[in-house]
Structure formats: structure tokens, C-alpha cells
């Protein structure tokens, strides 16, 4: 069974701009129940990725106040470009899903931005997507009566 990334990826894509502040990024992650956000420039080109873990590390800094409201205020002062991972690992839409799984395993990331042949960001494929496919493939089909 050969499944391509484009068949599995999520096309409902939430992105943020380089100039987005960290508090807005955190709110976007929480509001959309996602763990990573591709960071794009004004032309929609992928420039980086920011994860909920990146934001947790930024807010757990000993240099930030203990009070949550004060922490959020500090996050308002910084842009995602200051902590995003630049040049994230990506995969092309016509790649086999098994390649995405191997790439995630080797690079220890939970999701990959998906690019088309022209290098445009068109989706995301995540560990959850891979697990959903695995369940679908391995789950026994109930006998038909």
C-alpha cells in the first residue's frame, strides 16, 4: 500500500507571520488545538516553524516573572522570529508517507511542513496523521453479514 504525503496531510493550514508576537502565537496554538505553526514571510514563503515546546521554553525562562499575566506581557515584546526554528525539515507532497515517517523519526520532530514542487507551503503532516493511518491499516474489518 503506497500512500503519498499529499493524501494524508492536513490542508487546513494555520500559519503566522515573522512579525507575530509570541503571545499571539501561543493563543493561536491553543485556539486551534495544534502543536506547531509554520512561520511565513509576507509572500507566504516558509521561513521557520515554532512549536508549543519552543513557547514553553521561552515562558519558563528564569528571567521572566512568575505571574502568568506578567509572563504574557513579556511575550508581547518578542516576535516569533526571535525563537523560531529556521529552515525547518520539510517534505514534498508526492513523497511516500513512509519517507515522512522516517524523516520525523530521524530528526525527532512531530510534524513536517509539506511543500509542492515549486517549494510553496501547502500543508502539514504530523505524527498523529501517521498514527491515524496505522490504525486504519491495522484495524480489523468487521465481517459483513
Swiss-Prot record:
Start and end residues of each CBS domain: 9-66, 84-141
Entry keyword Repeat: yes
Keyword field: CBS domain, Repeat
Species: Dictyostelium discoideum (Social amoeba)
Gene3D superfamilies the record matches: CBS-domain
CDD domains, sorted: CBS_pair_AcuB_like
Entry-linked PROSITE patterns: CBS
Protein's name in the database: CBS domain-containing protein DDB_G0289609
